[in-house]
């Protein structure tokens, strides 16, 4: 047992905490003031990207505050947030299912009382009050303690059924089906267990996509992931120097239906594109780009049919100067990732701008890195996959003839752009072979 604090140590700790409280309170009051609201809104507007310097500074502040919280918070509360964490998830599910955000959006500026919300949504007033108390303390919904009225705030507004980001679909799918999948995590990490969490929970040997299709859930999955891609596209398009590619053709390896490629080509009208994917997926992509009713029909001349290529990127990749891969490699373990990277490296057309841009999470610690850790566990439990850290990406690149030129953070996106260029040693070896 540690020795008790001396009077001097206790006084020093008390003085430090009092000074910290004064500083945090003063900073909070400044951020709440009318003079700072416009500045703060630049970080939180959902219609444009935040200022990159301010976002980075705010992220550093959040990490520091969280580290400070970890030093001060009682251990039993930390544990409670984990074994009672289901409460927050399911309260948010309830709010989405009842369409509380839509109801409040149609109300006047004064907002609505719990009784009014309950009448409009068909809820028990007392139970709704309990759910809203949890959510408002997590900064979801605004609450006036004097009038006892609720309004939407910048967080809850993201869940409106017509919001362009469609985050409400994530609450529905991940708060229910994926929530159930997580039950399989404890058993899945045992050494004797071969199946991953999704297979254990649903008692199947099918992969997630096959099982979801059999259950009729696949449209919800595509709708959710598609909405997430749209929500993250502005940062992905803005925060990497895509202009360097000019009028060259980008081959999106594992590019699916072409949503990412389309967003890139619409922003850079000189660029051309192509997709390499499985035959069934390419058939679907052809309809999207080359049928008059397809959403990417306007890009048909820049994505000709011959650039929609059916194949297997574990075996061979067509020769191009520029490749991209978005949310593909986290499905695979390291041996397969090395095979894929080597296939692309072997086919790369040499040039001063030749590259492979990988759009994946950069697994990291700290409060602002938590989405990468959530993603890592989701990949583990649904696909036996993983997210990777910068160190892991650099090691994989070095072992497959590449080097990491730079990693670009991307605003409002869960991915970074990991810019791979052919390694100097590999290029030299090829010249002398």
UniProtKB/Swiss-Prot annotation:
The keyword Protein transport does not apply. Belongs to the class I-like SAM-binding methyltransferase superfamily. Cation-independent O-methyltransferase family. COMT subfamily. O-methyltransferase; part of the gene cluster that mediates the biosynthesis of aspirochlorine (or antibiotic A30641), an unusual halogenated spiro compound with distinctive antifungal properties due to selective inhibition of protein biosynthesis, and which is also active against bacteria, viruses, and murine tumor cells. The non-ribosomal peptide synthetase (NRPS) aclP is responsible the formation of the diketopiperazine (DKP) core from the condensation of 2 phenylalanine residues. It is an enzyme of class 2 (transferase). The gene is aclM. Pathway: Mycotoxin biosynthesis. The active site is at 330 (proton acceptor). SUPFAM superfamilies: S-adenosyl-L-methionine-dependent methyltransferases (SSF53335), Winged helix' DNA-binding domain (SSF46785). It comes from the Eukaryota. Keywords: Coiled coil, Methyltransferase, S-adenosyl-L-methionine, Transferase. Residues 5-37 form a coiled coil. GO terms for biological process: methylation; secondary metabolite biosynthetic process. The keyword Magnesium does not apply. This is O-methyltransferase aclM.
